[in-house]
Amino acid sequence: MTDIPPADRRIVSSRHLAQGDGWELSELEFGLIVGFNAFSRWVTRCMAAAGQPDLSPLEILILHNVNHRDKDKRLSDISFLLNIEDSHTVNYALRKLLKAELLVSEKRGKEVFYRTSPEGIALCEAYRDVRRQCLLNGLSPAEMSGAELRELARMLRALSGHYDQASRAAATL
């Protein structure tokens, strides 16, 4: 057993990154890693239960983004809103969603705009129903309130800005 009190134990995936100052960031990063993987698994299982088992997490997120506010979106809009640098992955996902008839596209001048098809809208609604049944109904307000969830979302968005700036700095090295 260890002599370190439970409150002082470092829960990290890379001990070499958790030594010295800033070790708490390594603990947060480990939480992000397992959270990202759990979220990816969740969205694919939720979408499968909604009736579409063949979509990747990115394709699911893009479908929901295009469906958001019933507004046509361009490739650049989707990439920007989801903070995806590699637009080729977004373009590939859009083609797959078009082939599955979950999206429709319309060329306007040099730009292509995407919107959710009636089948895509129905799938997003089925996903929402599964999400409500399996995820929301299992989340107790005692575990995390709506205000706490909003604050966590705000902190994650702020942290993403910090990581974006750090990635730009690293690219200059």
Q: Across the structure, where does each feature detected by a protein language model lie?
A:
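Pre-recognition alpha-helix immediately N-terminal to the DNA-recognition helix
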Residues: 31, 61-64, 122
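Basic amphipathic alpha-helical segments that dock to polyanions
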Residues: 63, 78, 93-100
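Helix-turn-helix DNA-binding helix
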Residues: 89-90
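Charged, amphipathic alpha-helical coiled-coil/dimerization segments
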Residues: 95-149
